[in-house]
């Protein structure tokens, strides 16, 4: 089994762990009803995308 030739520095270890940080998802606000939804996606509450009705959502 391979073994490390040199000790890994604290900076290199921290940089590797930084990729595992949790990033909270951002939300956009719908101008018609004020509901929050993920940007660049269809609003699941009313089926609107960029001002157009693309899904028929039954209320």
UniProtKB/Swiss-Prot annotation:
GO molecular function ontology, one term from the record: structural constituent of ribosome
One GO location term (cellular component): large ribosomal subunit
GO BP annotations listed: translation
Keyword Ribonucleoprotein: yes
Ranges of biased composition (kind: Basic residues): 1-15
Ribosomal protein is among the record's keywords: yes
Pfam families membership: Ribosomal_L32p (PF01783)
Domain of life: Bacteria
Stretches for region Disordered: 1-48
Keywords: Ribonucleoprotein, Ribosomal protein
Family: Belongs to the bacterial ribosomal protein bL32 family.
Protein name: Large ribosomal subunit protein bL32
Gene behind this protein: rpmF
